[in-house]
Amino acid sequence: MEKFTMSETKVWSGRIDSADGPTAVRWHQQVRAPQEDSPAGVALIGYPCDLGVYINKGRVGAANGPDEIIKALANLPWRLTHPVYDCGNIQWEGELEDAQAALATKVFKQLQAGHSPIVLGGGHDVAWGSFQGLRRHLDQAAPDKVLGILNLDAHFDLRSDSEGASSGTPFQQIAKYCKTAGKPFHYAVFGISEYANTQALFDRADKLGVTYLKDTHCGYTQLGPMLRALDAFLSKVDCLYLTIDLDVLPAATAPGVSAPAAYGVPLEIVEAMLDAIQRKALPVLMADIAEYNPTYDIDSRTARVAARLAARLAGLLGKPTTKA
């Protein structure tokens, strides 16, 4: 079995409220490294890579994201009934594709072990690595299951990869893979900014049959229609891969990202979408949190948001996956 290394011990540390009894526990007191016979749970995987952001001409710094999210997560109150494992950060040498391949291998192994991965990025090129690992697992465990990809993001990330992969190309790469493999490409993006995507990207999304809602249609007054659109998409698929780019949030909420949003989708709306997914009882096989950039954060504001979302996702994903 692959040997796993937990993130630095100093990261998993925090307050201990022993005087308040056995239920006054926090994440740092519960998370462990996985063992060969570990019961099914949630597997945290770090993707400390921002090469894709650099290639995409973005502001780098997201490589430091995973450990900073864990620092914020460590001190949160523990509210889960299933285990969470720290599988450490991926280890790789070389180019972006090498990092994505290393991630794919780690995601696949955790899914095969019955765990539900949550990958902490890192640039949104994380999605190509996550998808490859998930697709390999499904091809062995449940090849007939229809996979849906839900991306909460200000960007389509459908840029051409003709000159190489980047943080802007993962879903174009997935679309090409699906076409070659004869698989349906069920991709939805909620939170799209009209001012952060060229017309060429809107045209490509339309050509590929992408379901999307603009950020201006994801506000409080549009909550009903937005949730109906989400439900319609979820009804088309058997299982879900959920990926959250933190730049979907307003810059005031998430300043520490590679490309901050001028408008954005409120955190309350993002969490309403998570609630809707949970009510749907659709299997969420894995999730990502992408583009956290500590270099530009303010008072760890974005780290706290990312940690909150990670904790929510851990509750949403905490069901055994199908083993091959």
UniProtKB/Swiss-Prot annotation:
InterPro entries: HutG (IPR005923), Ureohydrolase (IPR006035), Ureohydrolase_dom_sf (IPR023696), Ureohydrolase_Mn_BS (IPR020855). It catalyses: N-formimidoyl-L-glutamate + H2O = formamide + L-glutamate. Pathway: Amino-acid degradation; L-histidine degradation into L-glutamate; L-glutamate from N-formimidoyl-L-glutamate (hydrolase route): step 1/1. One of its GO terms (biological process) is L-histidine catabolic process to glutamate and formamide. Its EC number is 3.5.3.8. It is an enzyme of class 3 (hydrolase). Mn(2+) 2 binds at D153, H155, D245, D247. Its cofactor is Mn(2+). One of its GO terms (molecular function) is agmatinase activity. It comes from the Bacteria. Catalyzes the conversion of N-formimidoyl-L-glutamate to L-glutamate and formamide. HAMAP family: Formimidoylglutam. This is Formimidoylglutamase. The gene is hutG.
